[in-house]
Amino acid sequence: LGIENPSLQDRIATEGWGAKFLSFRRSEGHWGQRFYQPKWISSHYTLLDLKHLAISPDNQAIRQSILQVIDTLKGSDGGISPFGAEQKCDVCLNGMFLNYASYFGMKEDNLKSIIDFLLTERMKDGGFNCHSNTIGATHSSVHSTISVLEGILEFTKSGYTYRREDLQNAEKESIEFLLQHNLYKSHKTGEIINKKIVMLSYPSRWKYDILRALDYLQNAGVRYDPRMQDALDLLKKKRLKDGRWPVQAKHPGQTHFDMEQAGDASRWNTLRALRVLQRFDD
């Protein structure tokens, strides 16, 4: 757990799910119809899937596709804007883009404006919300916050140094925002924010759930906090009798293919749950 084997990573491009994803790459270097359309077969979500597969970060076809996005879809506010340069960029989308663009080794200069855009959209309560620059949201979203946190983590893990102190502060405050909600509860009522976020889904896409949050926290090296415990207990209760975890739900949309079926035991969720419990379970 937690150890990448470069020789296996190289094989992902020619075998199994990784080879399947790459086979859908169009001749001009993209997937689907456009960068963000349709969900979930667009370039954006396919690149995110490939990153999560831990395919070699040196894959040149993937790097070329990301460079095309950087060269053609930068918005006037510095982020990636699939809907036109003058349209306001989406925080959640740019958090995810930063995640895989960092993993696949884009030049730091190409990512600086995305960092600037994201940091400009920090909310007063510590997190992020994709509606902060459109309809004037005043409370952070767990969905946007986890996407940006994952992007910041991959950016720093990949050795980039641009605005590191600002990113560390944003990371700290965003983690605190999630912990204030015990990872899934309203900070006002203590009730579950939304029943969907306690379901184990994969792929997560842009959507938050407790396993995605816990896996981020273990990956970021965050120390155990008692406010994680309710989510950890929920995760352990979802374990099947054979020791694995299921896919409890799928996010509707077009897919290139189904890696796993809802209701079945899941290799993805089992791997992620084991990583979480290895770090946080006594």
Give the location of each predicted region.
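Preference for long, amphipathic alpha-helical scaffolds in soluble/luminal domains
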Residues: 1-282
